[in-house]
C-alpha cells in the first residue's frame, strides 16, 4: 500500500473537479481525500500501487469537461504521517494564500436542458437549473475558494432535496455550489408589477410575441430583447437606443434555426452549441425577397449576422414554455445599457437606464457580482478570431513562458476597455468593460479591478497604462497608489500579439488601428515597429496627413477624404472640383475645411489607418459618415469582398507612382508607405466612373503590398524575420489574409491574434507583459 499527496493547479474551481476526483477514486478502488485549497486542489490517494497509478491516469486523462489542468505535482508520503484512510472524502475547502484560477461562467448543459423540459422532473421549467457542469461561476463570486457561502447563492439555503443531491457522490449535483430548485432557489419577477415566477415568464413571452421590448436579467447582466422577425419592433428598439445602423445580436432557438439563416460549418457548429456560447459572426444565407424570417434591420447592409444560442435557462424558457404562446425562432438580444454605459447588472440600474427603452423588465434576485457581456467571435481561415472576449472566456489566463516573477495591473485602453492582472507568466484579461468616455463605465472598471485583485489575491507592484495623459484608464492607473508604467498604444498592441503567441524574440510589428497617442504627440495608427519586451523603435508608418475637425472626423470620413485630396493636389480650386465630382460635401463645407487645413485649425497630424479606410470609403461613395465605430471601414471591406467573389485575381497596377517598392523618407529616416499616391489613384479612377467595389478591392490589395514591402525593407535592415499583426484594422479579414499570405510568400513567420482581440480589447495584455519585463529589469 502506498500514499501519495497530489496537488493539481489550473481551472479546478467551479467545474466539478472534486466530485470527479471522488468518482475516479471510487472507480480505482482507493481511499483518501480531496480538498480545495484555493490556488490548487490537494488530493491524498491511498491504496495498492496499481490502483493509485490507475487513479492518476484517470485524473490526467479524464478531468471534468470544463477544467484546465496546468500542472500536477505528486509526492510520496508515509502512512504514519497522515494515517490510514478508511474511505474517500471531500474535505471542506481551506483558505490558502496564493494565486487562484477562476472559472468563467458555463452555458447550460444538455443534461440540465433535458431535466428542465421534463414534466416529471422536480426542476421542470426552473429558470436557474444548473449542476457541476454548468451555470454561473465568475459572475456570482464574492471570494475564493469557490464555495456557496462565498457566492451570491449564499442568500438561498438549500432545501432538503437539493442538500441531499449536493452531498451524494452519485449525483450530477454533488458539491455543485449554485445548486437550487423551484423551492429554494432565486425567483424571477417583473419590476414594478405583481407577476413573479411562472406568471412573470408568461407575461414576458406574451410581450415579446405581441411586438414589445423587454429587458431581461441573465447571467452577467441585462439584455434588451424583442422579436427579431418583427420589423416594427426592431425599428422601434433602434429608435429608442438611438442606434440607426449598428448590427444587433440575435439569439436563435437552436442550431437548426441558425442554419436556416446562416451558413454554418462544422467548427462553427461546435462552438455555437458548446459550453461558452459566444456570439458568432456568421455569413447570411441568400434569402428570397418575400422571406419572413430574420428581418433586414437586424444587421442592415451587413453580409453577416451576430448570432448565439441560449446559454442561461431563463433564455431557453423565452423560446419554449408550456403556456401555448408560439414564439419566434429569433430574438434580438442586445446588451442592456444606454449608449456608453456598462451593461446593467441590478434592478436600480435597470430602472434608471432601461425603463425608457422597454415595456417590461424581467429581473431575478440572484445578485451579479461581476458584469460579463457576451463574447463576440469571428472566423478566419476556419479558426476562431475573437472580437470581444468576455463571458465564457474571461478570466482564463494567457500563459507566457518567460522567466518572469512579479504581479502587475494593466488598466487597458480608453475604448473597448478590458484590464489585465499579471502574475509571473500568467495574465488574466478581464471581461469586457466598455468605453471609458462615460464615467459610469470608469466606475465599473474601478469596481471590477478591486474585485479581481481580491479574488486572485494579488498585490500589484506596478500599474501599467496607455501613454495618453488624458485617458480615463490612465487616471485609474494613477489612482492605484503604485508606480505607473506608461506604454505607447501601438507597442502594446504588438506585445499583446507576441504574448498570445508566446513569442519571446524581436518582431516587426504592424499595428494598424484608428487612433493612438504617439511618442511625438501626434496621432499614430498605421505603424511599422521593431519591438520586443524591452522596447520598440518606430521604423515606418503610412504617409502622415492632417486630421481636421477633432473627434468628429472619426465619424465623418469625408473630412479626412478632403484633407487627403488637398494634400495631393496642393491646390484649392482643383481640390474643390474633385470634391464636387465625388459629391463628398457642399462647397461651403469644403471651403471651411480647406481654410482650417491652411491654418492647421483644430487639426492634428495623423497616421491613422482607420481614418484612411474611412476616407477611402467616402471617396468611393460607399459611406461618407459613420453612425457607429468602424461603419465606413466595414462597408469598404464588404464592397471589396463582394468584388473578390466575382474575380480570381486583379493584376491592374495603380500606377507607377504607387509602386510599393518606392518610398518616401522623413528626416529621421522613417520608412513612409506612400498611401497618398494610392489616394490619388483611387480619386482619379472614381471620377472616371470605375466601379466602387473594384476600387475598394484594389485599395486593400495595394495597401497590403505597401505593408509587405515595408516589412521586407525592415528585414533587410534588421535581419528580423517575424511579423506580428495587431490593431483593430486587422479585424478586416480581407486585409489580414492579403497581408498574411503575402508575407508568407516572402518567407516571413507571421503572428496574428486568435482568442485575444486584435482591437483595443486586447492591449491590456500587452501593457501587462511590458510591465512584467519592467519589473525584471528593475527600472
Model-derived features with residue positions:
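A contiguous, well-structured pocket-lining segment that forms one wall/lid of small-molecule binding clefts
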Residues: 178, 185-187, 413-451, 563-720, ...
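Conserved phosphate-binding/catalytic loops in two-lobed NTP-binding clefts
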Residues: 466, 481-493, 721-724, 733, ...
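Conserved phosphate-binding catalytic cores of ATP/NTP-utilizing and phosphoryl-transfer enzymes
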Residues: 259-265, 317, 343-348, 374-375, ...
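Short glycine-rich phosphate-binding loop at a beta-alpha junction
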Residues: 215, 457-469, 718-729
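Internal gly/pro-rich beta-alpha loop/helix module
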Residues: 62, 165, 323, 327-402, ...
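A phosphate-binding glycine/aspartate-rich beta-alpha loop in the early core of alpha/beta enzymes
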Residues: 76, 159, 221-286
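Glycine-rich phosphate-binding/hydrolytic loop that grips phosphoryl groups
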Residues: 491-512, 516-518, 557-566, 701, ...
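Intrinsically disordered, low-complexity, mixed-charge
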Residues: 1-178, 182, 189
Amino acid at each position: 500500500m502506498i500514499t501519495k499527496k497530489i496537488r493539481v493547479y489550473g481551472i479546478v474551481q467551479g467545474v466539478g473537479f472534486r466530485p470527479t476526483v471522488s468518482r475516479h477514486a471510487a472507480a480505482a478502488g482507493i481511499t483518501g481525500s480531496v480538498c480545495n485549497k484555493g490556488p490548487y486542489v490537494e488530493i491524498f490517494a491511498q491504496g495498492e500501487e496499481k490502483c493509485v497509478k490507475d487513479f492518476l491516469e484517470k485524473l490526467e486523462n479524464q478531468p471534468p469537461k470544463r477544467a484546465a489542468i496546468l500542472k500536477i505535482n505528486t509526492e510520496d508520503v508515509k502512512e504514519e504521517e497522515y494515517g490510514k484512510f478508511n474511505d474517500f472524502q471531500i474535505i471542506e475547502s481551506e483558505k490558502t494564500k496564493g494565486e487562484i484560477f477562476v472559472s468563467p461562467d458555463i452555458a447550460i448543459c444538455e443534461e440540465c436542458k433535458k431535466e428542465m423540459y421534463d414534466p416529471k422532473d422536480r426542476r421542470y421549467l426552473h429558470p436557474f437549473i444548473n449542476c457541476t457542469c454548468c451555470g454561473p461561476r465568475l459572475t456570482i463570486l464574492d471570494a475564493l475558494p469557490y464555495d456557496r457561502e462565498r457566492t451570491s447563492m449564499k442568500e438561498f439555503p438549500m432545501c432538503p432535496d437539493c442538500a441531499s443531491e449536493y452531498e451524494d457522490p452519485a449525483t450530477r449535483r454533488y458539491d455543485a455550489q449554485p445548486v437550487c430548485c423551484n423551492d429554494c432557489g432565486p425567483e424571477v419577477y417583473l419590476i414594478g408589477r405583481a407577476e413573479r415566477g411562472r406568471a412573470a415568464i408568461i407575461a414576458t413571452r406574451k410581450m415579446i410575441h405581441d411586438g414589445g421590448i423587454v429587458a431581461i436579467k441573465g447571467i452577467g447582466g441585462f439584455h434588451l430583447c424583442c422579436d427579431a422577425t418583427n420589423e416594427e419592433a426592431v425599428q422601434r428598439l433602434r429608435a429608442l437606443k438611438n442606434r440607426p445602423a449598428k448590427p444587433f445580436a440575435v439569439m436563435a432557438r437552436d442550431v437548426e434555426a441558425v442554419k436556416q439563416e446562416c451558413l454554418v460549418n462544422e467548427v462553427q457548429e461546435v462552438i455555437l452549441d458548446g459550453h461558452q456560447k459566444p456570439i458568432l459572426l456568421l455569413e447570411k444565407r441568400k434569402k428570397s425577397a418575400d422571406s419572413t424570417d430574420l428581418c433586414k434591420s437586424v444587421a442592415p447592409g451587413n453580409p453577416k449576422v451576430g448570432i448565439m444560442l441560449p446559454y442561461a435557462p431563463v433564455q431557453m424558457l423565452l423560446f419554449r414554455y408550456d403556456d401555448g404562446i408560439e414564439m419566434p425562432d429569433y430574438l434580438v438580444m442586445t446588451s442592456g445599457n444606454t449608449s456608453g454605459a456598462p451593461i446593467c447588472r441590478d434592478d436600480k440600474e435597470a430602472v434608471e437606464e432601461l425603463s425608457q427603452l422597454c415595456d417590461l423588465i424581467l429581473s431575478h434576485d440572484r445578485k451579479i457580482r461581476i458584469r460579463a457581456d457576451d463574447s463576440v467571435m469571428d472566423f478566419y481561415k476556419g479558426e476562431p478570431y475573437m472580437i470581444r472576449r468576455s463571458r465564457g472566456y474571461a478570466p482564463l489566463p494567457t500563459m507566457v513562458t518567460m522567466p518572469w516573477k512579479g504581479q502587475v495591473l494593466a488598466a487597458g485602453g480608453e475604448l473597448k476597455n478590458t484590464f489585465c492582472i499579471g502574475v509571473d507568466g500568467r495574465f488574466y484579461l478581464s471581461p469586457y468593460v466598455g468605453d471609458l468616455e462615460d464615467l459610469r463605465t470608469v466606475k465599473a472598471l474601478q469596481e471590477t479591478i478591486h474585485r479581481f485583485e481580491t479574488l486572485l489575491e494579488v498585490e500589484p507592484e506596478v500599474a501599467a497604462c496607455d501613454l495618453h495623459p488624458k485617458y480615463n484608464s490612465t487616471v485609474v492607473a494613477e489612482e492605484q497608489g503604485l508606480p505607473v508604467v506608461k506604454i505607447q498604444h501601438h507597442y502594446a498592441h504588438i506585445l499583446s500579439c507576441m504574448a498570445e503567441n508566446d513569442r519571446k524574440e524581436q518582431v516587426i510589428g504592424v499595428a494598424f488601428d484608428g487612433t493612438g497617442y504617439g511618442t511625438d504627440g501626434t496621432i499614430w495608427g498605421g505603424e511599422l515597429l521593431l519591438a520586443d519586451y524591452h522596447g520598440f523603435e518606430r521604423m515606418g508608418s503610412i504617409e502622415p496627413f492632417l486630421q481636421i475637425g477633432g473627434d468628429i472626423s472619426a465619424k465623418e470620413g469625408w473630412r479626412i477624404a478632403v484633407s487627403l485630396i488637398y494634400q495631393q493636389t496642393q491646390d484649392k480650386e482643383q481640390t474643390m472640383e474633385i470634391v464636387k465630382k465625388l459629391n463628398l460635401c457642399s462647397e461651403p463645407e469644403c471651403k471651411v475645411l480647406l481654410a482650417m487645413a491652411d491654418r492647421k485649425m483644430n487639426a492634428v497630424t495623423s497616421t491613422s489607418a482607420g481614418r484612411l479606410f474611412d476616407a477611402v470609403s467616402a471617396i468611393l461613395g460607399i459611406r461618407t459618415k459613420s453612425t457607429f465605430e468602424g461603419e465606413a471601414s466595414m462597408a469598404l471591406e464588404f464592397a471589396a469582398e463582394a468584388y473578390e467573389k466575382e474575380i480570381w485575381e486583379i493584376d491592374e497596377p495603380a500606377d507607377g507612382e504607387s509602386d510599393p517598392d518606392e518610398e518616401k523618407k522623413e528626416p529621421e529616416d522613417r520608412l513612409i508607405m506612400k498611401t497618398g499616391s494610392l489616394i490619388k489613384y483611387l480619386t482619379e479612377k472614381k471620377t472616371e466612373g470605375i466601379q466602387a467595389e473594384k476600387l475598394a478591392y484594389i485599395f486593400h490589395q495595394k495597401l497590403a503590398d505597401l505593408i509587405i514591402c515595408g516589412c521586407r525593407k525592415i528585414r533587410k535592415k534588421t535581419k528580423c524575420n517575424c511579423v506580428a499583426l495587431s490593431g483593430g484594422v486587422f479585424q478586416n479579414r480581407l486585409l489580414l489574409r492579403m497581408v498574411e499570405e503575402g508575407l508568407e510568400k516572402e518567407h516571413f513567420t507571421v503572428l496574428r491574434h486568435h482568442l485575444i482581440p486584435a482591437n483595443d480589447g486586447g492591449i491590456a495584455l500587452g501593457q501587462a507583459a511590458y510591465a512584467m519585463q519592467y519589473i525584471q529589469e528593475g527600472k
